[in-house]
Curated annotation (Swiss-Prot):
Pfam families noted in UniProt: AcetDehyd-dimer
Protein name stated in the entry: Acetaldehyde dehydrogenase
Superkingdom: Bacteria
Molecular function as annotated in GO: acetaldehyde dehydrogenase (acetylating) activity; NAD binding
Source taxonomy: Bacteria, Pseudomonadati, Pseudomonadota, Betaproteobacteria, Burkholderiales
Length: 297
């Protein structure tokens, strides 16, 4: 175990499913010293669980982090898009590095397997959406393999029990941010994102299907680029795998994937939450390594 002084001090803002799963991931890492889990309701199950894990908690939200701004260096914001826009006003002024797990789209868009090395000294990194983290690696791989993408559609299906209040309240932002990121990372002329919430019991594992109308000359190159990208994602999301490898018909490419969660806190079927948390941890670990390298030079 590393000395606490060599670890990055972390606060988690948001005590729902994403925040709690992050708590277990952060506590398991030797790179981080988890200082706080902060929510809004003192008697919430999330804050009770955090306290039972010997983590300091508060139900005072952003006000608590303002009062204790010298106690942490990095914040995971797992609230909502609207709340993040308020929260980041303080964090940016205080010089805190924020990893935004909401679809607020304020900071640098990041998918670790694509542009982790490009985030540099950004104050705010946005992880887009769970569907974005699942589909964008494949969209980017297609960009490398085809001449042009005319239209790109992504359909994600998730279990109802893995869709919390914030997810349901942010549906519009989910669509807008995912579609924007798809255009940015793929170069597609038109994009569309669809999220289906499946009430089936037991919960069904997250599945995302990508449809692309594209011009290409070598479909073997499409397969190779997609396969290479899948392996890159699996470096930080081990449960990421294709269920339908690239197939083509009359200029339309179809690819489908599933994500099995690690089961740190969330059930394995909640791959939609696990993938964005794994991405968050990858970004945080990269920033930790960069900061430590800078301190030794």
């Amino acid at each position: 175990m590393k000395n606490k002084s060599s670890r990055t001090r972390v606060a988690i803002l948001g005590s729902g499913s994403i925040g709690l799963d992050l708590m277990f991931k952060v506590k398991a890492s030797e790179h981080f010293d988890l200082k706080f889990v902060v929510g809004r309701h003192a008697n919430s199950d999330g804050l009770k669980l955090a306290r039972s894990c010997n983590v300091e908690t508060s139900s005072d939200g952003l006000d608590f982090l303002k009062e204790n701004e010298d106690a942490y260096d990095l914040v995971f914001d797992a609230t909502s898009a609207a709340a993040h826009k308020v929260n980041n006003g303080f964090f940016s002024g205080a010089g805190k590095f924020v990893i935004d797990l909401t679809p607020a789209k304020l900071g640098r868009l990041c998918v670790p397997c694509i542009n982790l090395d490009d985030i540099g000294a950004e104050q705010n990194v946005n992880l887009i959406t769970c569907g974005g983290q699942a589909s964008l690696p494949l969209a980017y791989a297609l960009k490398q393999a085809v001449d042009e993408i005319e239209y790109l559609e992504v359909v994600s299906a998730i279990a109802s029990r893995s869709a919390g209040i914030a997810t349901r309240e942010n549906i519009d932002e989910y669509m807008t941010t995912t579609e924007y990121a798809l255009a940015q990372f793929s170069g597609a002329k038109k994009t569309k994102a669809i999220l289906n919430i499946n009430p089936a019991e037991p919960g069904v594992r997250m599945q995302t299907t990508l449809y692309a109308h594209a011009r290409y000359r070598d479909f073997d190159r499409v397969r190779a680029c997609v396969a290479e990208m899948v392996e890159k994602v699996r470096e930080y999301v081990p449960g990421y795998r294709l269920v339908v490898e690239p197939i083509e018909s009359q200029g339309r490419i179809t690819i489908s994937l599933t994500v099995r969660g690690r089961g740190d806190y969330l059930p394995e079927y909640a791959g939609n939450l696990d993938i964005i948390n794994c991405a968050a941890l990858a970004v945080a670990s990269h920033r930790h390594a960069t900061a430590r390298l800078g301190a030794t030079q």
